[in-house]
Regions:
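Charged, solvent-exposed interaction patches on well-folded alpha/beta domains
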Residues: 11-205
Length: 205
C-alpha cells in the first residue's frame, strides 16, 4: 500500500517463489512531458498514459559548460560553480534531465492532481505530439507552447517557430517541417496546421 501511495509507482508485480517467499517489483511511471504552469510557477510530470505524476523540482542550474544540473539529493544544493535557473529556464532544465518534452504557457485553469488522469484537452494534445513525433524531431524541439489547442506551437533549438495547431496528422506535420528545414535556408517560421497547405517565412539573406 505504501508503494502504491507513491504517485511515481504505477503498480506492483507480485511473484511467489518457493517455498514461502514473495518478490514485489514496483512498476514506475516515466515522465513523457513536463507541464510548466507560469501563473503558479510550478511544473508537473505527466506519464505516457496521460496521468499526472507529481510536481517536478524547479531547483535547477546550468553548469559552466551550459548543461542542466539538479541539486544534490542529500544536501539539496546545486553543484559548486553552477548558475541558478528560475521559472521557465528551470523548467527547461528539469525537462532535459528527465528526458521529457516541456509543455509551456499552460493555461491557468489546468489543475494537476497526483495519480489522476489528465483531463485538460490542451495538455492531452501536447502529450499526443510528444508521443507522435520521432525521437530525432523531439531532440530538435526546445519546448511546446500550449496556450490553447488551436494555438499549439513548437519552438525549435535553432530558433524556428512551428505553428502546429490541433494534434492531428502529426507524422505528416513532422515530415513537412523536416523537409522544409533541409531544403530552405534562413527559415524563421513554419505554419503546418494544415500540412497539405503549409506556409513559411525566411529571414532576408
Amino acid at each position: 500500500e505504501s508503494l502504491q501511495a507513491n504517485p511515481w509507482i504505477e503498480g506492483v508485480d507480485i511473484k511467489r517463489e518457493f517455498p514461502h517467499r514473495l518478490v514485489v517489483t514496483p512498476r514506475e511511471r516515466v515522465a513523457k512531458v513536463i507541464v510548466y504552469i507560469p501563473a503558479d510557477d510550478v511544473a508537473w510530470a505527466v506519464s505516457e498514459k496521460g496521468v499526472w505524476i507529481a510536481p517536478v523540482s524547479l531547483i535547477a542550474g546550468a553548469s559552466a559548460e551550459g548543461k542542466p544540473v539538479g541539486p544534490d539529493p542529500k544536501t539539496g544544493q546545486l553543484p559548486e560553480g553552477a548558475t541558478m535557473l528560475e521559472g521557465l529556464d528551470a523548467a527547461l532544465a528539469a525537462a532535459k534531465m528527465a528526458h521529457a518534452l516541456l509543455l509551456t504557457d499552460a493555461p491557468s485553469d489546468v489543475n494537476p492532481k497526483g495519480g489522476k488522469e489528465v483531463t485538460s484537452k490542451v495538455v492531452l494534445a501536447g502529450l499526443e505530439y510528444a508521443k507522435g513525433f520521432s525521437v530525432k524531431f523531439l531532440q530538435q524541439i526546445k519546448d511546446l507552447s500550449i496556450p490553447s489547442v488551436e494555438a499549439i506551437s513548437a519552438n525549435l533549438n535553432n530558433g524556428v517557430e512551428v505553428s502546429l495547431g490541433a494534434a492531428d496528422n502529426i507524422a505528416e506535420k513532422e515530415r513537412v517541417v523536416m523537409g522544409l528545414l533541409e531544403k530552405e535556408s534562413g527559415v524563421t517560421y513554419v505554419n503546418v496546421r494544415k500540412p497539405g497547405a503549409y506556409t513559411f517565412r525566411s529571414a532576408p539573406l
